[in-house]
Regions:
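Outer membrane beta-barrel strand-and-loop segments of large Gram-negative receptors
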Residues: 1-45, 71
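A short, polar/proline- and glycine-enriched secondary-structure boundary/capping micro-motif
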Residues: 2-3, 54, 137-139
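Extracytoplasmic loops and strand-loop junctions of Gram-negative outer membrane beta-barrel proteins
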Residues: 9-16, 55-60, 95-98, 144-148
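A general structural-boundary detector
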Residues: 17-19, 31, 63, 102, ...
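Long, well-ordered mid-to-C-terminal structural blocks that present hydrophobic/aromatic surfaces
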Residues: 32, 42-63
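Beta-strand elements of well-folded, non-transmembrane domains
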Residues: 34-38, 50, 80, 94
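Conserved C-terminal beta-signal and adjacent last beta-strands/turns
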Residues: 65-185
């Protein structure tokens, strides 16, 4: 796993991929679908994780860290109209505080929305979307561990986009001869 170390010998930050002595994760997941007639379809997914990492030869600062964290994701699709085929999708995601080596990873989350228009007998789809509406999806990890003191600030970006998909259809899988395995006998 890649992690950062501030050298005690000179003013330098060292990013290096290391194998930890020990890493263990235990988790549980629940997924709850929910539907109201044909106009609302939703799914809530909850995940809980216990995470343990240990490294006795991590430079001059061995660590043994444990953290419980949770993840929640919700997907919602609203059918605004069937003729024309118009759907609104709103998704949300949140991740509580976690660890990675000596890093502390802060809480993060995002909300995305998309408006989907299907036409041409279901062969064409026009999709307008906005990802990370509130600009909260990017984390700024930090280290406050023994002699290490680092704060990273990363920017979040809202993304707008348009996509178009057309299904040409008519694909039929070719019939193929079976593999000759007689030589393996």
């Amino acid at each position: 796993m890649q992690t950062l170390y501030q050298s005690s010998q000179r003013l330098v930050e060292i990013y290096k991929y290391l194998n930890f002595d020990y890493q263990q994760k235990f988790g549980i997941q629940a997924s709850v679908p929910f539907k109201i007639k044909n106009w609302f379809n939703s799914r809530l997914t909850l995940i809980g994780i216990w995470h343990h990492e240990k490294d006795n030869d991590f430079w001059d600062i061995p660590f043994n860290r444990k953290q419980c964290y949770g993840i929640a994701q919700m997907n919602n699709t609203f059918t605004l109209s069937t003729r024309p085929d118009l759907k609104l999708t709103v998704t949300g995601f949140v991740h509580s505080k976690a660890i990675q080596g000596i890093y502390d990873l802060p809480t993060s989350g995002n909300v995305n929305a998309a408006l989907r228009y299907g036409f041409a007998k279901g062969k064409a789809i026009l999709n307008l979307y906005c990802n990370d509406i509130f600009e909260t999806g990017q984390i700024s990890p930090r280290i406050r561990f023994q002699t290490q003191n680092v704060t990273n600030h990363y920017s979040c970006f809202r993304e707008f986009g348009v996509s178009f998909t057309y299904k040409f259809g008519g694909y039929k899988e070719k019939q193929r001869e079976g593999v000759d395995t007689s030589r393996f006998k």
